[in-house]
Amino acid sequence: EDTGSEATNNTEVSLPKPPVIENGYVEHMIRYQCKPFYKLHTEGDGVYTLNSEKHWTNKAVGEKLPECEAVCGKPKNPVDQVQRIMGGSVDAKGSFPWQAKMVSHHNLTSGATLINEQWLLTTAKNLFLGHKDDAKANDIAPTLKLYVGKNQLVEVEKVVLHPDYSKVDIGLIKLKQKVPIDERVMPICLPSKDYAEVGRIGYVSGWGRNSNFNFTELLKYVMLPVADQDKCVQHYEGSTVPEKKSPKSPVGVQPILNEHTFCAGMSKFQEDTCYGDAGSAFAVHDQDEDTWYAAGILSFDKSCTVAEYGVYVKVPSVLAWVQETIAGN
């Protein structure tokens, strides 16, 4: 078997001739493997045999070649589960390699979340920052600056807004090129099940703002529990009964709360700092699979201790739309 590190690029490599055995014959086989941070995607097993027509074929898929796709949700240095973070901690180890930084054309920073080698999720509100309400996706895309990993600038090809973005605060960003995956840049997995049950702990990362409302240059993260939805609705809307609702948001901005959202909040003893950026993932660790999933995307940030809850769009609510959009673009 030739398991050479780099697949031989149409250049003949002289291998020693295998010894002949009595009543036997030699069959030429190769096995495809992927570089670190990528995994083999194929219905076969990656092993190909040279047939009589001198074509490499696999038992299950014939001549169709496998692909190497990015591994998701497996950070090399996952955040320390034991640490209880209330004030927000600096991410020195690259525990959130899916976190991207988005800068609008008038220099407002927000977050975005890498979900494969070429696509990111963010909020529709982020995409409209500094644009008129009737701006088109084609006008927005060229105005964005996007950074992944250690401040690596990546070029945006297009923006796709959720068809119902006034209710579902979500948009997708496609990059011009696939971004190479390594320990600093890795997508988070998208969940097919709902991880947002009350009390579940998730991690939110972002550049946030310090108490002077200045953006910080260091990625920070905070650990938060999923909150009771009714309490959150009462906090922002005064009542869970539609007729009795009156917007009473303590911060003057009304978050979008509906069946596509969940809330997460902290104890009241938080420091005078805002964490997380809209567009960042509510990342949960599935311990059975040892995999990190984006349960939600931060839509409305708690505004520095005044409001108790952050509001997130449920990723399973938009999963079908995300998959269709990526497949069609």
UniProtKB/Swiss-Prot annotation:
Tagged with keyword NAD: no
Look up the domain of life of the source: Eukaryota
Tissue specificity, in the record's words, reads: Expressed by the liver and secreted in plasma.
Compartment(s) where it occurs, according to its Swiss-Prot or TrEMBL record = Secreted, Extracellular space
Domain Peptidase S1, by residue range, is 85-327
Q: Name one GO cellular component term.
A: blood microparticle
Pfam families per record: Trypsin (PF00089)
BP term (GO), one? zymogen activation
Its main subcellular localisation, reduced to a broad class, is: secreted
State what this protein does.
As a result of hemolysis, hemoglobin is found to accumulate in the kidney and is secreted in the urine. Haptoglobin captures, and combines with free plasma hemoglobin to allow hepatic recycling of heme iron and to prevent kidney damage. Haptoglobin also acts as an antioxidant, has antibacterial activity and plays a role in modulating many aspects of the acute phase response. Hemoglobin/haptoglobin complexes are rapidly cleared by the macrophage CD163 scavenger receptor expressed on the surface of liver Kupfer cells through an endocytic lysosomal degradation pathway.
Q: Partners and quaternary state?
A: Tetramer of two alpha and two beta chains; disulfide-linked. The hemoglobin/haptoglobin complex is composed of a haptoglobin dimer bound to two hemoglobin alpha-beta dimers. Interacts with CD163. Interacts with ERGIC3.
This chain belongs to the protein called Haptoglobin
The organism of origin for this protein: Canis lupus familiaris (Dog)
* Taxonomic classification: Eukaryota, Metazoa, Chordata, Craniata, Vertebrata
